[in-house]
Amino acid sequence: MAEVKEEQPKRFSLWNFWISSLLLKLLLIPDYYSTDFDVHRNWLAITNKLPLRQWYYEHTSQWTLDYPPFFAYFEWFLSQFVPSYVKSDGCLDIVEVGQFGMPTVVFQRLTVIASEILLFVVLQVYINTSKVSERTQSFVVASSIAISPGFLIIDHIHFQYNGFLFAILIASIVAAKNKKYLWCGFFYSVALCFKHIYLYLAPCYFVFLLRAYVLNLKDFKFKSYRDLIFIVKWRHLVKLGSVVIATFAVAFGPFIFDLPQLLTRLFPFSRGLTHAYWAPNFWAIYSTIDKILTMVFLKMPYTYKLASQFISPPLIPASLNEIKAKMAANNNGSKGLVEDVYFVILPQIVPKLTFLLTLLYQVLAVVPVLFDPSFKRFMGSMTLCGLASFLFGWHVHEKAIMLVIIPFSFLVISDRRLLSSFMLLTSAGYVSLFPLLYESQDFLIKTFYTYVWCVIYFFAFRKTTRLSTSVERRVFFLDRLTLVYMFLLIPMVFLIQIRDILGWKYLVLQRFEFLSLMVYSFYCSVGIISAWFGLSWLYNFDEPLWVSNE
């Protein structure tokens, strides 16, 4: 009889993805870089040249150190490998404005590429620790993150270290999936000590670890109030608390006498509501409406008279002269300045309001985790916590959309009903990053790479995600509307590029210089907010979707 060969399980490796992406990243070394490049160069200089206690006081340059201590230690570590010819190029000079050449550019670009190896390693661990039946899905998720357009645009052209930082966050996600709760808490604490933007995810981590690891609700039976002491697994609480406290002690301990100064650097509340380029969130729509109303009222005064009959001050300016005075005196958000934004027509927004809105929607996201601390619920809660902070937060950067896309990538494979929201979020989110690369030389790379990624992975996710288990296929809005929105992104991007190219030639186009950024912000915010609505509906009202398969 012929020997029957056992079918070997498929091997899913990210090695080929790393090699191919490495070649592209090396080609991008001499490309455009943003002011963030000099920011990190200055941080290299500060951590290399100054004593540790002076790191958060140094202000020769406007690019002061404003990341948590672990990232400062990371910059110090990188500075130890700066070659002598790069030092002589000005890489480690503490100056007001950096003066450097190609040696510094090459060195810093290579540090980003080298540090991103951790991302590929963590994603490979995610694949290898998945069940054999889930390896294909895990591979799609891991590869989509590994070659994400977001990391290419933000890290390898614009210049940051997000791939390395998100690797640590993903390590905590992988630990949670494998029920390694102490490692989950440890890696999240480390990530938080590297970049404080991860603080937005703290509510979902706190509730998840509390419910899954610390509280003993499964076997708990209430007979008297004395029994409440047994609801807590005290040993687990001590171990988890020790891990978290020890991590923060290592990070912040050397700065114990300078914590007030450090905190003022980490949380500069003097910044305005919106960034120079409006992040595509709720406040982008709010700002756009204010801008349109201002133009309409000034161009067509009768519309103001009509509106003032139904709306009275302070909800609307008392007169057209007041509108003109506000336009002349304040930054109305259309100048591309990073400072306090004052709305001309609509009521002003204060930090307290943005905090309350963010907190409200984050609380709604974490409550279900108290009753069902499954990995699927955890990922849904993390995605919605990220969305709440992105949509309603104060001074949100467009790059923060990665805080939403990454956890959603781990969630979407669980059910095809999530795919419409995911496609909306990723397409709008990645396109919203295009203004970061405003030079014409980068137009083809950012558009072609992003569109190819979208086509490949939208089909891959559709093929590998689980089919809906409920009888009624409740999909947010209509899949066709999602496709229409996504296809309209293509002409929007090309028309804006044409306007930018012709803007210097025609005076009429120069009068609408900020129109391109406004269209990007407004249209992408519509897609992201729609994705939030869709995911929120499924998260709160489609119970069969969240039935745990663990």
Curated annotation (Swiss-Prot):
Residues 1-11, 131-150, 211-236, 299-352, 414-417, 462-475, 535-550 are lumenal. It is a multi-pass membrane protein. Coiled coil: none annotated. It catalyses: an alpha-D-Glc-(1->3)-alpha-D-Man-(1->2)-alpha-D-Man-(1->2)-alpha-D-Man-(1->3)-[alpha-D-Man-(1->2)-alpha-D-Man-(1->3)-[alpha-D-Man-(1->2)-alpha-D-Man-(1->6)]-alpha-D-Man-(1->6)]-beta-D-Man-(1->4)-beta-D-GlcNAc-(1->4)-alpha-D-GlcNAc-diphospho-di-trans,poly-cis-dolichol + a di-trans,poly-cis-dolichyl beta-D-glucosyl phosphate = an alpha-D-Glc-(1->3)-alpha-D-Glc-(1->3)-alpha-D-Man-(1->2)-alpha-D-Man-(1->2)-alpha-D-Man-(1->3)-[alpha-D-Man-(1->2)-alpha-D-Man-(1->3)-[alpha-D-Man-(1->2)-alpha-D-Man-(1->6)]-alpha-D-Man-(1->6)]-beta-D-Man-(1->4)-beta-D-GlcNAc-(1->4)-alpha-D-GlcNAc-diphospho-di-trans,poly-cis-dolichol + a di-trans,poly-cis-dolichyl phosphate + H(+). Keywords: Endoplasmic reticulum, Glycosyltransferase, Membrane, Transferase, Transmembrane, Transmembrane helix. One of its GO terms (biological process) is dolichol-linked oligosaccharide biosynthetic process. It is found in: Endoplasmic reticulum membrane. GO terms for cellular component: endoplasmic reticulum membrane. GO terms for molecular function: dolichyl pyrophosphate Glc1Man9GlcNAc2 alpha-1,3-glucosyltransferase activity. Residues 33-109, 172-189, 258-277, 374-392, 439-440, 497-513 are cytoplasmic. Its EC number is 2.4.1.265. Its main location: endoplasmic reticulum. The chain crosses the membrane at residues 12-32, 110-130, 151-171, 190-210, 237-257, 278-298, 353-373, 393-413, 418-438, 441-461, 476-496, 514-534. Pathway: Protein modification; protein glycosylation. Belongs to the ALG6/ALG8 glucosyltransferase family. Dolichyl pyrophosphate Glc1Man9GlcNAc2 alpha-1,3-glucosyltransferase that operates in the biosynthetic pathway of dolichol-linked oligosaccharides, the glycan precursors employed in protein asparagine (N)-glycosylation. The assembly of dolichol-linked oligosaccharides begins on the cytosolic side of the endoplasmic reticulum membrane and finishes in its lumen. The sequential addition of sugars to dolichol pyrophosphate produces dolichol-linked oligosaccharides containing fourteen sugars, including two GlcNAcs, nine mannoses and three glucoses. This is Dolichyl pyrophosphate Glc1Man9GlcNAc2 alpha-1,3-glucosyltransferase. It comes from Candida glabrata (strain ATCC 2001 / BCRC 20586 / JCM 3761 / NBRC 0622 / NRRL Y-65 / CBS 138) (Yeast). The gene is ALG8.
